[in-house]
């Protein structure tokens, strides 16, 4: 029997090595004394050394007789038991015996060398026994009886619980990431080793990082004990050594510490022949799978065959097989881990591998299909190349690259009007493509570049058409009104007729939505018989959309201008750039600056697109831009364009457009015949007046389409054979009128004035309302000094979502009104005793602009004089702080808004007289206009009952 004498306790140990082999249970224990002092040292020194070295004793076993070194050899070096003599495999061959004999000789030689080297400082004891398995641990040094059970850690020891998303079996090793909260809880046990308990999280908590392991109920009760070591590189490693069960949780705070108990295998069951039978069946099944599915198991499969044949420990066998198959089924693996019987664990593993066959078959099919596709592609490529070579040798077909080069050379020869510089660029690119392999990515990029260069209309221009009658007929047939624009286009054609050629121009149509800006551009192209191309720059932030992308980028292409020329196949088309006032701008690129190079006549003669990188002449292109507001157009662009404003349509124009354009078009679109629906002129007028408030025609077009749809429904249902739309049944088709009047007041109250405004959607009325609050005087009982302190200063407050310009106008108007009132009536102290609140209704709509000054002054004076403004009066104009009324814009739009609201009198600045007189007669009819040079002209019309006060004016 192998035993440890009591005298071993008193030895000064630093290293104990147990070397053994399967042919003999001889254990050689080498006891090294690291104390370099001589044996003649005094007893005190010896005693101290004994005490210091007793804490560093350790024992390590290598069970080479059980396992092949190819698999998990490092794990098995730390297994603390050895087998009886002859306890290994009975079928070991002669080679194994020879290896064991060599190991014996090697051990003896090492013992002899160490004895000679240390001059007697090493003490060696050889003990032999064939009966028992010896427990090897730190506790081994404290007992003489060989019957003690193995104790690497006490039965009731405590470990830190580490929740895991996967199941670990005995013999599993690897790195582990430990958080600070775990590291602080790791405390070595009495033997100096550090342990963790690995436990699988339950399914409900497994993939939730916020709840994983936060409660003890979220983990399973059975897991494995793992020894944790810290490598010199600072990485923690673990090795599982024992199945364990949680007995009791010692703390209620994460991470948990629990007392555990080991789950050992039944020694009698380990002798059950079914264990070896099941392991053999699993080995055979694994080898069979390798033959059936060779494409699935190709990596390290040969090593695995050798390894599983020599592993006879069931726990390590389980880990090796599961890791090889990659059985990532946490719940099933947890059941195997919790099962006490070794036989049942192996049976469960066997059935789990059997169930893997459908998945393996699918993986094999996928791998085979992929391999077949790859092989087919390779064969096709090989045959294609062989066919090319054969054709080239026979002279039946030229090379594909040669055909490509020939194609571009022919295209270049057809470009007779191309400039020499551009021609040289194409020639250089053709030469470059002839030197490049067709399979390279640069070849396809060069080919795409040559496609663009050779397909552009270099020097190709469509014929100019200067027929004024034809142009006028086209413009009149497509649009009603818009006389200014039609006149400008006819002037443009007349100049071209005299010169014999048309030079490119840049026109900009500014007007509300639905006023025909885009359609008039199409009519211009139609009148001139030129190609038409439209693109929008609204919300455009990338200047590459205008000037193209550089060829260094993947998928690069020219900008919109060059694309337009390629599509139209002419160098003098009509190009419409829509929504130019909504073009974007950012720090990394300014599309408006790129557009400047396109529209500037001095620069577009040699426009260089980033992609083409060669000049192109855009001077003959007619550019037309559209915008809703001229204020939002960049100043540099606006300076290079000829601005033509489309103010919108008045009621009479809208009625004519609905009657002559919208209704006939809608009849065709809906398929309704003329004898199936009739719409009277009174109905059209009612629709224009009470169902639409826009200055364009889009909303009117939607209303007519709605009538047509309801008519079609009645015709199809058979409820009517013909529909006659009248004022009586109009509400059945369009509902209740959306608008009744723009006016809030039939009789204008005190402090209220009807102003006129110009918006992106046309003209509109803008009411200005004022009210006052008397300032409270201080109590007379207070001392004079306190009365002066408590005296509140009069002020003005503005509301109604006014912009910065209108806010400044209100301040100017308040100052002017106080001074003007003081001269009119020095005894009127209204502004000194009242706080003023000035408001513009519809606060959800932002309002701004330099034309509300006279309206604000009039509202304040109406409040101060307690006199209402004349009924049916509208006004617009900005006032200076000295009372001068200055010019405004949007005269036509504001006049239209005044007529729509039923106003009969309008006040305009005197400098806008010419703008009003240029308006058509049907717009000016029924409007009485007063032109104001300074504010006293406004006061005379607004307050006819107070005109006598004007005699008191001295300054204004």
Swiss-Prot record:
Residues 777-795 have a biased composition (Low complexity). ATP binds at residues 511-518. GO terms for molecular function: ATP binding; ATP hydrolysis activity; ATP-dependent peptidase activity; sequence-specific DNA binding; serine-type endopeptidase activity; single-stranded DNA binding. SMART domains: AAA, LON. Residues 747-945 form the Lon proteolytic domain. Its main location: mitochondrion. The keyword NAD does not apply. Its EC number is 3.4.21.53. It comes from the Eukaryota. It is an enzyme of class 3 (hydrolase). Residues 37-57, 83-123, 777-800 are annotated as: Disordered. Keywords: ATP-binding, DNA-binding, Hydrolase, Mitochondrion, Nucleotide-binding, Protease, Serine protease. Residues 159-357 form the Lon N-terminal domain. It catalyses: Hydrolysis of proteins in presence of ATP. The keyword Hydrolase applies. InterPro entries: AAA+_ATPase, ATPase_AAA_core, Lon_bac/euk-typ, Lon_lid, Lon_proteolytic, Lon_Prtase, Lon_prtase_N, Lonm_euk. GO terms for biological process: cellular response to oxidative stress; chaperone-mediated protein complex assembly; mitochondrion organization; oxidation-dependent protein catabolic process; protein quality control for misfolded or incompletely synthesized proteins. It is found in: Mitochondrion matrix. This protein may be expected to contain an N-terminal transit peptide but none has been predicted. Homohexamer or homoheptamer. Organized in a ring with a central cavity. NCBIfam families: lon. Belongs to the peptidase S16 family. ATP-dependent serine protease that mediates the selective degradation of misfolded, unassembled or oxidatively damaged polypeptides as well as certain short-lived regulatory proteins in the mitochondrial matrix. May also have a chaperone function in the assembly of inner membrane protein complexes. Participates in the regulation of mitochondrial gene expression and in the maintenance of the integrity of the mitochondrial genome. Binds to mitochondrial DNA in a site-specific manner. HAMAP family: lonm_euk (MF_03120). This is Lon protease homolog, mitochondrial 1.
């Amino acid at each position: 029997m192998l035993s440890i004498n009591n005298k071993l306790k008193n030895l000064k140990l630093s290293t104990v090595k147990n070397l053994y082999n399967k042919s003999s249970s001889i254990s050689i224990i080498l006891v090294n004394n690291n104390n370099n002092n001589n044996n003649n040292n005094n007893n005190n020194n010896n005693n101290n050394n004994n005490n210091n070295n007793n804490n560093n004793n350790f024992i390590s076993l290598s069970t080479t007789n059980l396992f092949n070194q190819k698999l998990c050899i490092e794990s098995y070096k730390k297994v603390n038991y050895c087998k009886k003599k002859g306890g290994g495999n009975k079928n070991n061959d002669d080679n194994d015996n020879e290896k064991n004999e060599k190991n014996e000789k090697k051990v003896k030689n090492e013992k002899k060398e160490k004895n000679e080297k240390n001059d007697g400082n090493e003490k060696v004891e050889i003990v032999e026994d064939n009966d028992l398995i010896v427990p090897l641990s730190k506790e081994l040094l404290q007992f003489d009886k060989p019957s003690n059970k193995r104790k690497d850690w006490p039965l009731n020891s405590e470990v830190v619980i580490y929740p895991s998303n996967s199941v670990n079996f005995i013999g599993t090793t690897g790195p582990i990431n430990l958080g600070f909260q775990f590291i602080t809880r790791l405390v070595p046990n009495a033997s100096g080793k550090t342990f963790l308990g690995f436990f699988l999280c339950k399914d409900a908590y497994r993939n939730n990082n916020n709840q994983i392991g936060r409660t003890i109920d979220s983990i399973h009760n059975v897991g494995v004990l793992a020894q944790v070591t810290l490598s010199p590189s600072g990485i923690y490693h673990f090795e599982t050594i024992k199945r364990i069960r949680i007995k009791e949780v010692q703390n209620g705070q994460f991470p948990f510490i629990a007392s555990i108990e080991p789950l050992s295998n039944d020694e009698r069951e380990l002798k059950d022949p079914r264990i070896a039978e099941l392991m053999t069946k699993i080995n055979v099944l694994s080898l069979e799978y390798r033959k059936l599915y060779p494409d699935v198991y190709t990596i390290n499969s040969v090593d695995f065959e050798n390894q599983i044949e020599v592993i006879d420990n069931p726990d390590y066998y389980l880990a090796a097989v599961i890791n090889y198959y990659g059985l990532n089924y946490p719940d099933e693996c947890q059941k195997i881990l919790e099962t006490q019987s070794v036989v049942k664990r192996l049976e469960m593993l066997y059935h789990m591998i059997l169930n893997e066959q459908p998945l393996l078959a699918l993986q094999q099919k996928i791998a085979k299909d992929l391999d077949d596709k790859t092989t087919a592609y390779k064969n096709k490529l090989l045959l294609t190349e062989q066919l090319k070579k054969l054709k080239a040798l026979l002279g039946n077909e030229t090379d594909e690259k040669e055909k490509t080069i020939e194609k571009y050379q022919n295209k270049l020869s057809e470009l007779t009007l191309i400039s020499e510089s551009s021609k040289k660029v194409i020639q250089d690119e053709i030469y470059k493509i002839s030197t490049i392999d067709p399979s390279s990515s640069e070849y396809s990029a060069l080919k795409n570049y040559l496609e663009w260069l050779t397909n552009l209309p270099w020097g190709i221009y469509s014929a100019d058409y200067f027929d004024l009658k034809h142009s006028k007929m086209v413009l009149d047939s497509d649009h009603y009104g818009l006389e200014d624009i039609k006149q400008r286009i006819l002037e443009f054609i007349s100049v071209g007729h005299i010169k014999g050629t048309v030079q490119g121009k840049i026109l900009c149509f500014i007007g509300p939505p639905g006023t025909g800006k885009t359609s008039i551009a199409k009519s211009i192209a139609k009148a001139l018989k030129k190609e038409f191309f439209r693109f929008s720059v609204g919300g455009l932030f990338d200047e590459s959309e205008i000037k193209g992308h550089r060829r260094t980028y993947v998928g690069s292409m020219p900008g919109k201008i060059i694309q337009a020329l390629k599509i139209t196949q002419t160098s003098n088309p009509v190009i419409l750039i829509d929504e130019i006032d909504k073009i974007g701008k950012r720090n990394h690129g300014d599309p408006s600056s790129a557009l400047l190079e396109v529209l500037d006549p001095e620069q577009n003669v040699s426009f260089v697109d980033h992609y083409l990188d060669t000049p192109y002449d855009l001077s003959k292109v007619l550019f037309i831009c559209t915008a809703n507001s001229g204020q939002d157009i960049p100043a540099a662009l606006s300076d290079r364009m000829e601005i033509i404003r489309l103010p919108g349509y008045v009621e009479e124009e809208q009625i004519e457009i609905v009657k002559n354009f919208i209704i006939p078009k809608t009849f065709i679109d809906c398929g309704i015949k003329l004898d199936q629906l009739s719409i009277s002129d009174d109905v059209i007028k009612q629709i224009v007046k009470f169902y639409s408030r826009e200055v364009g025609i889009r909303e009117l077009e939607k209303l007519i389409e709605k009538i047509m749809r309801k008519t079609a429904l009645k015709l199809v249902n058979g409820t009517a054979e013909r529909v006659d739309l009248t004022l009586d049944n109009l509400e059945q088709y369009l509902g209740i009128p959306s608008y009744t009047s723009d006016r809030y007041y039939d009789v204008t109250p005190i402090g209220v004035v009807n102003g006129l405004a110009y918006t992106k959607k046309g003209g509109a009325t803008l009411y200005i309302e004022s009210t006052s609050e008397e300032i409270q005087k201080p109590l007379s009982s207070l001392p004079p000094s306190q009365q002066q302190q408590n005296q509140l200063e009069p002020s003005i407050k503005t509301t109604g979502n006014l912009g910065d310009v209108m806010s400044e106008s209100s301040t100017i108007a308040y100052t002017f009104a106080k001074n003007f009132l003081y001269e009119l009536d020095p005894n009127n102290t209204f502004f000194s005793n009242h706080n003023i609140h000035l408001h513009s209704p519809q606060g959800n709509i932002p309002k701004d602009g330099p034309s509300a000054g006279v309206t604000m002054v009039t509202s304040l004076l109406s409040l101060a004089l307690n006199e209402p403004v004349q009924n049916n009066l509208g006004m617009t104009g900005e006032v200076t702080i000295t009372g001068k009324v200055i010019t405004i814009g949007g005269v036509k739009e504001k006049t239209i808004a005044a007529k729509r609201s039923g106003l009969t009198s309008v006040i305009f600045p005197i400098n806008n007289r010419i703008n009003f007189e240029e308006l058509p007669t049907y717009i000016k009819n029924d409007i009485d206009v007063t032109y104001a040079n300074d504010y006293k002209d406004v006061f005379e019309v607004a307050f006819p009952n107070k005109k006598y006060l004007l005699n008191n004016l001295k300054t204004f």
